[in-house]
Amino acid sequence: MDNVANNDVDVLEKQAAFLSSALPYMQKYENETVVIKYGGHAMGNLALGQAFARDIALLKQSGVNPIVVHGGGPRIAETLKKMGIESRFESGLRVTDEKIVEVVEMVLAGSINKEIVALINAEGEWAIGLCGKDGNMVFAEKVHKTVIDPNSNSERVLDLGFVGEPVEIDRTLLDFLACSEMIPVIAPIAPGRDGKTYNINADIFAGAIAGALEAKRLLFLTDVPGVLDKEGKVLKELTVTEAKNLIKDGTISGGMIPKVETCINAIQGGVEGVVILNGKTSHPVLLELFTEHGAGTLIIS
């Protein structure tokens, strides 16, 4: 020990202090389900991906039941471009035809999903890759998106093709995996009762899974630090009512609106709390769950 430099001792002491201070939070989440939506630019960074996998492994070792739901939009766009498949857009939304949904399923369920599974397994845990089709876990229906036509100022329904929303969730498989000490990693692909395959927004998919399981927490790893006030500062905690008011007064705007609305729907569906946090930082999951002040914006009922 005499050979260890003082700064090394300081680092070790800080690590020990963190572990000690984390104990009550580990106890708080023991045997609880935490759904983590993994997405954003962090997915394209190997070092952050490995850190994320280690965090998930640590959650499992701490007695938490983590469930990972992932997206993969940038990789899908990249693959479509490589394959020479052009995308068509309606009011800024991608139309997913039969050819594109096959590529989406290949990329999400066949490529990205298995990469995340491999990273978690490399940390000594048992992760298993799934999508909504497995065990009839999720059934979807076609999304009917209504927009205002700028020319006529009247409503019209967009046909986005094979874009769906979850309407039925059977938790049997997920409950079984929790009892068998496995970590589910789920791609947001699901069948419809019509026999077709649907691509589902990963945020909405994660919210539906978390609601069906009455999860203790749903974490959205994003490219932003949380919900910001008008001065650009992170709001540490919001109630559903406060979040709705911030949408009304324009504080919450743009792409953050559908994300916060998904948080609200998840809470109304049975989730105790939903957190929006920055997935581009080191160990955001541990900082949120195992520290006093958390790492993002917590939305509660």
Curated annotation (Swiss-Prot):
Q: Where does the UniProt annotation locate this protein?
A: Cytoplasm
Q: Which biological process terms from the Gene Ontology are attached to this UniProt entry?
A: arginine biosynthetic process via ornithine; L-arginine biosynthetic process
Listed SUPFAM superfamilies: Carbamate kinase-like (SSF53633)
Binding-site positions, substrate: G72, G73, R94, N199
State any GO CC term.
Answer: cytoplasm
Pathway of action = Amino-acid biosynthesis; L-arginine biosynthesis; N(2)-acetyl-L-ornithine from L-glutamate: step 2/4
Establish whether keyword ATP-binding is in the entry: yes
Q: Which GO terms describe its molecular function?
A: acetylglutamate kinase activity; ATP binding
Swiss-Prot/TrEMBL site (Transition state stabilizer) positions: K37, K259
Q: Please give the Pfam families that the UniProt record associates with this protein.
A: AA_kinase
* Reactions performed catalytically: N-acetyl-L-glutamate + ATP = N-acetyl-L-glutamyl 5-phosphate + ADP
E.C. no: 2.7.2.8
Please, which domain of life does this record's source organism belong to?
A: Bacteria
Keywords, A to Z, come to:
Amino-acid biosynthesis, Arginine biosynthesis, ATP-binding, Cytoplasm, Kinase, Nucleotide-binding, Transferase
**What does it do?**
Catalyzes the ATP-dependent phosphorylation of N-acetyl-L-glutamate.
Regarding protein family, the annotation reads: Belongs to the acetylglutamate kinase family. ArgB subfamily.
Q: What is this protein called?
A: Acetylglutamate kinase
In the UniProt record, the gene name given for this protein reads argB
